[in-house]
Amino acid sequence: MKRTDAADREAEASDAHSAQSQSTAPRASRWRRARDNIWPSWTTRDMGFLLAARVCMSATRALAGVLVPIYLALIGYSGFALGALFAVVALSSAALTALIGVLSDRMGRKIFIVVIPWLAAAAALVFALTRYGPLIFTFAALGSFGRGAGAGAGTVGPYQPAEQALLADAVYARHRNSLFGRIAFASSLGALIGSGPLTVLPGVLGRFGLPVTHGLAPYRFSFVVLAGMSLLAGILAIPVREARPVRDPVPAAPVSGQRWRRPHLRLSAKTRPILYRLWATNTVNGLAVGFFGPFITYWFFRRYGAGASVVGPLFAVITLAAMVSNLLAARFAAWLGVVRAITVSRALQAVLIVPMVLAPTFWLAGAFYLLRMLAQRMGLPLRQSYVMGVVAPEERGSVAALSNLPSQAASAVSPTAAGYLFDHVALALPFEIGALLQAVNTVMFFVFFRALRPPEESERRQPAP
């Protein structure tokens, strides 16, 4: 009996150890899955630096999106004057984006990811130190202040084509949607920081006796913080290693008697039709966004009297919720197909503008804006990834820049008209016009691209050998 009891106790101990091991294994497995979802094995050191730089630069864009419209309104800018400023910013950003996109395919991408944030830092210091109109217009244009305003204002400015091309070159096609989802997540994280903690920082410091809470002092202090974040974004990109794309050799000089032709940008026969269709859809989208995109903060300020300390936290809450969309973007595309997923996202963006501008209270309008941003933040990385996937690697920087050029140029046309409508007609009308144009853009995008699949979807549909 003693021997049997000992054996029973040993068996019970063994079973307990086995059960503990089995219960520990799922926990370890869940931890590994969670870790892999956040930082998969295919990510690299350079991706980490670029994502960190994206967080910092996105934070500055989000903070500027809250500060600039309200600050300029407080120092006397009308809706029409704001529209003129945003038009100048859109034109300069379009020119810079096109130039950087083309040059990045030839000179390399890293230099622009370092220098452009430092231009934003200089612009922030100018806003902090002077009200002189020509300086404000000039440096707003150089720093791209006035683009990407609103919750989740995580754009990073004119260097985005260079950044997209550098990141797209670093992964296999099957991982590209996931990588761009993480880029969008980093943008949302930066926007969360910029529109949340950084907008309330002056008030927090004021509780400790610092003189940064009266008059325009909170705005000027925040511009100095913005400059510091922009400097840090450029510094973080310095350690990134870049492999230059291999291009076809330069053609030999023409032989005697042949007519010399000025060299110009050449894209492959496969890429040109894609670019033309992107130009058409992005032109309409640029017109739409120009009517309301730069004015989101200004509209909340005019419609509900909400200042930066109220609008900023609202944007932070919206951005926090929208971050989930970034990480689900790849699954959404795998379920519907990337073109259908982008189409659904754009349709929702157009529809949800209308109840937002008709909402009687600030927080109800904020709730509709939240729903719209959930759709927008899911569609944005998919569109960027899709464009990078359907063009040749050596043309990605050029296409990323050139495809957005009509959008940025068109978005320079509508802000001035929107500003006039804000001042003289109705606050809701520019938003309603923008919603109609976005609906047209949605139909155009689906018609133009429904038959053009990215490589990862084409590979899945090929029959096994």
Each predicted region: which residue ranges?
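Juxtamembrane intracellular "pre-TM" segments in multi-pass secondary transporters
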Residues: T24-T44, E242-V284, Q462-P465
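Helix-loop boundary and gating motifs at the non-cytosolic
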Residues: A34-A94, I274-F315
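Hydrophobic core of transmembrane alpha-helices in multi-pass small-molecule transporters
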Residues: V55, A123, G133-Y159, L166, ...
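Transmembrane alpha-helix termini and helix-breaking/packing motifs in multi-pass membrane transporters
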Residues: P69-I70, L74, A191-A217, Y298, ...
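Central cavity-lining transmembrane alpha-helices of secondary-active solute carriers
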Residues: A84-V102, A316-L328
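Helix-to-loop junctions at the C-terminal end of transmembrane segments
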Residues: L96-G108, P202, S325-V338, F422-D423
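Structural signature of the two symmetry-related core transmembrane helices
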Residues: I111-V126, R340-P355, A435
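C-terminal membrane-cytosol helix-exit motif in multi-pass small-molecule transporters
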Residues: G194, L198, P202, G206, ...
